[in-house]
């Protein structure tokens, strides 16, 4: 990367190293799909997801990035000027920034939603005990993948999408 070519690089992360992809996105979702396609039980699929995250985590660790010459700051960040970012007790000045903020699940304002055990992409992969019936809101790629995976794992799944499914 840039640090290996002599650039000064700072990585600011307020959450877990590896961000959304490693912890609550691509890695656990693909591990779950793989386990479900193999016909694993929910328990075995759960363990496969956790093991897969643990195997990849060292590649996204603070130690690895620091070993590559990247300064890692565990904090929230905000721009305080055109070329200045404040992160925790640090102030960083740079000519260029890459902003990769990740995402936050949106909980729709539905009547009764506060009365159910709600799962999001941030909690789905650690769901215990095994869900027997899921209602998936959203028929995009993630919603369809999770519908398929949990159905293969034996759960009843209902998928709801507000847009037309096919033209």
State what each model feature region is.
Residues 30-31, 37, 81, 114, ...:
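Generic secondary-structure boundary signal with a strong preference for alpha-helix termini
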Residues 51-58, 62, 125-126, 131-135, ...:
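Rossmann-like dinucleotide-binding cores of NAD(P)H-dependent redox enzymes
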Residues 13-14, 162:
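The feature marks cytosolic C-terminal regulatory regions of anion transporters and related permeases
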Residues 29-52:
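Glycine-rich active-site loop/strand segments that organize a redox cofactor
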Residues 1, 5, 10, 17-27, ...:
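FAD-binding core/adjacent interface of flavoenzyme oxidoreductases
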Residues 15, 140-141:
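Glycine-rich NAD(P) Rossmann-fold beta1-alpha1 loop
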Residues 5-8, 38-41, 120-122, 152-158:
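Short amphipathic alpha-helical segments, especially helix-boundary/capping motifs
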């Amino acid at each position: 990367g840039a640090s290996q070519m002599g650039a000064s690089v700072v990585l600011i992360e307020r959450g877990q190293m590896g961000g959304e992809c490693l912890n609550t996105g691509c890695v656990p979702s693909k591990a779950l799909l793989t386990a479900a396609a193999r016909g694993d039980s929910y328990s075995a699929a759960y363990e496969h997801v956790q093991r897969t995250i643990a195997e990849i985590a060292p590649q996204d660790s603070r130690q690895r990035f620091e070993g590559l010459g990247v300064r890692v700051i565990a904090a929230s960040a905000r721009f305080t000027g055109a070329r200045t970012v404040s992160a925790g007790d640090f102030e960083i000045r740079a000519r260029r920034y890459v902003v990769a903020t990740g995402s936050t699940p949106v909980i729709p304002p539905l009547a009764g939603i506060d009365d159910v055990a709600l799962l999001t992409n941030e909690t789905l992969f650690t769901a215990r005990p095994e869900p027997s019936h899921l209602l998936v809101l959203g028929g995009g790629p993630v919603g369809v993948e999770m519908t398929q995976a949990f159905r293969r794992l034996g759960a009843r799944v209902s998928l709801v999408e507000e847009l037309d499914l096919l033209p």
